[in-house]
Structure formats: structure tokens, C-alpha cells
Amino acid sequence: MLKYWLGIVGLFVWGGCSTSFTPQEVKVIKEGGGIMRVWKTDNREDSLFLRQQAIELTPGEIRTELFQVLKQRMLATVNDSADPGVGIAAPQVGISRRLIAVQRYDKPGAPFEFYINPGIVSASEEQSLGKEGCLSVPDVVGEVWRSNEIVVRYIPELTSIKRMLSREKTDSTFKFEVKVEYRNTWEP
């Protein structure tokens, strides 16, 4: 019984620890509609911003209408017919939060799915070579070796931590979005 109550109290406390989006983030999320400006590495200010460590989203932020608007606008941006992508991270649209949208080629219809506070738990040693580009790195496409399978940890909108296995093209997109946007281990 004590474990039960501690669990409930823990969820309440964790759920109650809410920081807010900054006034600048609120402005970026709300301004305009649909497609957002993609921050680019060939712009000095954008590049410096993209290199910052992104902040984890809190349960309080995840439950806001603003979070839903951010997701809708990120999806519109990654699906922009003028510059489509297979993945996008919140920092790429000026929001320093750990949120990515990944096109799931391993699912029927290749839908986009969002992942909150993602992290790569493990990666297979077996790798494949594939072409990659990035919405934030204009006019650069290269071949990169990526693990064939990865295990990703993330928090779904319902607040429990989950793990999933990703394979092939989807795996490559996950690794790129998580590594580039949150670990700052790349050079443009």
C-alpha cells in the first residue's frame, strides 16, 4: 500500500514540476501559422542556437495547448513541399526543447510520430551506409554509417517512460535527430 501511495505522490510531484516555455518560445510557436522558419547552420545566430543543449519538456508543458500547436507547426514544417524532410527537432524551429518528429518508414503509410525527451539507449553493431541530409544544413547531403537497429527511450504524452526498437531508415532518422540536436557532437 505504501508503494502505491508513493507512486501516486511521485506522479503528482513530477507532474506538478512545470517550467514554462520562455516568452520568446511562446512568440515563435504562436506567430504566423503552419510552416515555421527553419534555423540554419549557415546563419551565425541560428548556428549558435542549434549548438545549445536542448531542455527536457516537463509534464506541465506537455499538457498545454501551446505544446499541441508546436507539434502541429513542426509537422507542417517537415512536410513543407518546398523543403520536405523525414525528421525534425524542436531546436530546428527555434524551440530549445527535446522534442522530435520522425517519419516511421517501418510502419504502414510511413506516418510521422512525435517523441518527447528522446534518448538512444543502445545501438546494434551492424551498420548500413545511407544518404543523409538535414533541414538545418542547407545543400549538404552525405553518406553516413548508421546502426541497423537502435533502442530509443522517450516519454509519451501520457507520461510514462517507454522504449522501442527502431530499424533501417527510421533508425537512421532517429539517430540523426537525437544526436545532432541534443548531443551537439557534429560540425556543419
Locations of the language-model features?
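Bacterial Sec-dependent N-terminal signal peptides
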Residues: 1-23
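Positively charged
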Residues: 17-188
